Amino acid sequence: MIASVRGEVLEIALDHAVIESAGVGYRVNATPATLGGLQRGSEARLVTAMIVREDSMTLYGFPDSESKELFGLLQTVSGVGPRLAMATLAVLEPDALRAALAEGNVTALTRVPGIGKRGAERMVVELRDKVDAVASTSGAVPLGAGGGGSVRDQIVEALVGLGFPAKQAEQAADSVLAEAPESTTSTALRSALSLLGKTR
């Protein structure tokens, strides 16, 4: 089991980064916020969880152990796999997620693409007593530049990858960039996620 990866960031894409450690490049899937805190050519450390399937081994990376624990906890809910767990962490930061679960805030949970009302209610029932809604002391992840391509295209592609309809993703990207045309990909993507969360 690979519990963490430390090394030079070789590549930053929309949904993953490649980090070289001891001569081996590890592809690590992560949320936009986590990827935004990385910088190509600089050293980084991510706490990781490895998901092993019959036909694949996938690494998921997190800025801290708290996020990793929530990722694992989410997957104990029936119908929630790694992809949906990551989408949840992309839309709701750890503090907001714990609060939503502890308070039974179904509306907040249904902002996540792929989670409907019944799924959100199931999450609350199964996880309410397992989370601590006390605010985290960990700092916010700093945002930085992402990969290639236009900022708009990257935002749309990332949102579609998280499960949002293409038209909705395009509208959110256009709205965010109209208000802040100089935004980096990571900043704009977080704004778009926030906007979509409010309109769901």
From Swiss-Prot:
Subcellular compartments: Cytoplasm
Domain II: annotated span: 64-142
Molecular function, one GO term: four-way junction helicase activity
Gene3D superfamilies: 5' to 3' exonuclease, C-terminal subdomain, DNA helicase RuvA subunit, C-terminal domain, Nucleic acid-binding proteins
Short name of any one Pfam family annotated for the protein: RuvA_N
Region of interest (Domain I), residue spans: 1-63
Main location: cytoplasm
Region described as Domain III: 147-200
InterPro entries from the UniProt entry: DNA_helicase_Holl-junc_RuvA_I, NA-bd_OB-fold, RuvA, RuvA_2-like, RuvA_C, RuvA_C_sf
SUPFAM superfamilies registered for this protein in UniProt: DNA helicase RuvA subunit, C-terminal domain (SSF46929), Nucleic acid-binding proteins (SSF50249), RuvA domain 2-like (SSF47781)
Region of interest (Flexible linker), ranges: 142-146
Subunit description: Homotetramer. Forms an RuvA(8)-RuvB(12)-Holliday junction (HJ) complex. HJ DNA is sandwiched between 2 RuvA tetramers; dsDNA enters through RuvA and exits via RuvB. An RuvB hexamer assembles on each DNA strand where it exits the tetramer. Each RuvB hexamer is contacted by two RuvA subunits (via domain III) on 2 adjacent RuvB subunits; this complex drives branch migration. In the full resolvosome a probable DNA-RuvA(4)-RuvB(12)-RuvC(2) complex forms which resolves the HJ.
Stated family: Belongs to the RuvA family.
Protein name, UniProt field: Holliday junction branch migration complex subunit RuvA
